[in-house]
From Swiss-Prot:
Zn(2+) binds at C16, C18, C36, C39. Part of the 50S ribosomal subunit. HAMAP family: Ribosomal_bL31_1 (MF_00501). GO terms for cellular component: ribonucleoprotein complex; ribosome. One of its GO terms (biological process) is translation. It comes from Leptospira biflexa serovar Patoc (strain Patoc 1 / ATCC 23582 / Paris). This is Large ribosomal subunit protein bL31. Belongs to the bacterial ribosomal protein bL31 family. Type A subfamily. Binds the 23S rRNA. It comes from the Bacteria. Pfam families: Ribosomal_L31.
């Protein structure tokens, strides 16, 4: 087999925007993510309902609901 054909497998840190740091190993080094299992609504059980651009109001107006 050929030697030195595999990438280096080094210790890495995954840093989330919420401040969580997870230590793991990777071939690409440190990784930055926007959302992780500590802050994702699916894993936390806390749902955030965001009405972006008034979609609910637009729906109610379209179907004449109060």
């Amino acid at each position: 087999m050929k030697t030195d054909i595999h990438p280096k497998y080094v210790a890495a840190k995954i840093k989330c925007a919420c401040g969580t740091v997870i230590e793991t190993r990777s071939t690409s080094g440190d990784i930055s993510v926007e959302i992780c299992s500590n802050c994702h609504p699916f894993f936390t059980g806390k749902s955030k309902l965001v009405d972006t651009t008034g979609r609910v109001d637009k729906f109610k107006k379209k179907y004449k609901m109060k």
